[in-house]
């Protein structure tokens, strides 16, 4: 059943044989830091956030220690146990993929948003079956992850039975690493596409006022026996917004071609890029893809346009209201049974060439390395998350 698949999927992500550290009495007694210490109320992109100080020292966590820290921080800040499970695995998967700055770093924001009322960690998403293959999920201003997981319980069996199924999510939140969600569907044997809109940081070609966000897209290709042949997960801008933000916090410049200043001129100053706009990947073509994402994730879902969404940075208690779109296709039914063979040939045509790699290969290499070495987390950020826990 679908429920059994979801349980098995989450269990398979767990790393056996690793002991959990007991939470110390001191961390249990510690109080969550004031939200104002974590978020800039005046949206100053130069603010030093926990976990980004240049001089911070790193700790290294086992996957089980990291899982416990993530889960306990979410619960401590006000997430229900049911809503925290899938979310915890997504954040852990992000860290194990080596996507530094997208896992632990954003978790402190998630916890702060819980305390400020920007997101509801306990709400139960509402599912509306528009037809046998189309589903709308109202996240009800809660986290995206529980809403996506709840929707997948309908999307997966519908795609398996009918060959294709679509799901939209509205009144939602940051979907974080999209590849976790599309990979989830691919491991269920489905060809998957996902997208999300976010707050505007990209101006239209020739303009200087942002109208769409980095608007990431992801697709995942299934392989036999619950594996993933390859997976693509990328923003529709040259780099992610987090990359610019981290450059500001670390006092680094950026290459020309990543961002524009407020007048629409190229800049190597990441702070000017954050107050100006980001460059779409491939110029006009990248903007067009970002525009498609905006249509799929706002007009089609019933969610707000990026220009109408709440701020992820400002601590104002206002919901963010992102939208998400997912498409799942049963590949054997649609291909006449030759999908796996064709994908195998496609993969071989790439990997047989020297110096090439499949999309997502680096993340898999990072996973193996971090399973051996431990997952790094800066001491200050670790203490912040422990306090939330």
Residue locations for each model-derived region?
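Short, Lys/Arg-enriched N-terminal segments with co-localized hydrophobic residues
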Residues: 37-54
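Phosphate/diphosphate-binding glycine-rich loops and adjacent basic-rich segments that engage nucleotide
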Residues: 202-271
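Small-residue-enriched flexible segments
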Residues: 241-302, 319
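A generic, well-ordered mixed alpha/beta core segment in the N-terminal half of proteins
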Residues: 135-224
């Amino acid at each position: 059943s679908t429920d059994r698949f979801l349980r098995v999927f989450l269990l398979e992500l767990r790393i056996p044989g690793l002991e959990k550290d007991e939470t110390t009495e001191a961390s249990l007694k510690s109080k969550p830091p004031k939200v104002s210490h974590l978020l800039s109320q005046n949206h100053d992109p130069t603010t030093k956030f926990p976990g980004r100080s240049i001089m911070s020292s790193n700790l290294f966590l086992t996957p089980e220690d990291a899982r416990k820290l993530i889960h306990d921080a979410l619960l401590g800040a006000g997430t229900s146990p049911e809503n925290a499970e899938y979310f915890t695995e997504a954040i852990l998967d992000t860290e194990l993929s080596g996507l530094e700055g997208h896992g632990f770093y954003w978790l402190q924001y998630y916890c702060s948003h819980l305390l400020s009322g920007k997101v509801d960690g306990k709400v139960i998403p509402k599912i509306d079956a528009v037809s046998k293959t189309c589903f709308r999920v109202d996240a009800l201003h809660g986290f995206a992850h529980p809403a996506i997981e709840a929707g997948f319980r309908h999307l997966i069996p519908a795609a398996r039975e009918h060959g294709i199924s679509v799901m939209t999510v509205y009144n939602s939140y940051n979907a974080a690493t999209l590849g976790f969600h599309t990979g989830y569907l691919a491991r269920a044997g489905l060809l998957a596409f996902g997208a999300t809109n976010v707050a505007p940081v990209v101006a239209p070609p020739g303009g200087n006022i942002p109208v769409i966000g980095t608007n990431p897209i992801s697709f995942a290709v299934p392989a036999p026996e619950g594996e993933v042949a390859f997976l693509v997960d990328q923003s529709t801008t040259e780099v992610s917004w987090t990359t610019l933000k981290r450059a500001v916090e670390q006092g680094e410049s950026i290459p020309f071609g990543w961002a524009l200043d407020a007048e629409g001129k190229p800049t190597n100053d990441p702070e000017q890029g954050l107050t100006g706009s980001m460059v779409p990947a491939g110029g006009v073509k990248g903007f067009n893809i970002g525009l498609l994402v905006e249509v799929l994730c706002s007009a089609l879902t019933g969610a707000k346009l990026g220009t109408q969404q709440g701020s992820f940075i400002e601590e104002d208690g206002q919901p963010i209201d992102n939208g998400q779109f997912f498409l799942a296709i049963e590949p054997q039914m649609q291909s006449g049974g030759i999908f796996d063979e064709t994908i195998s040939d496609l993969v071989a045509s790439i990997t047989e060439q020297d110096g090439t790699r499949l999309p997502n290969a680096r993340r898999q290499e990072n996973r193996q390395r971090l399973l051996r070495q431990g997952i790094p987390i800066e001491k200050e950020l670790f203490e912040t998350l422990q306090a939330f826990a």
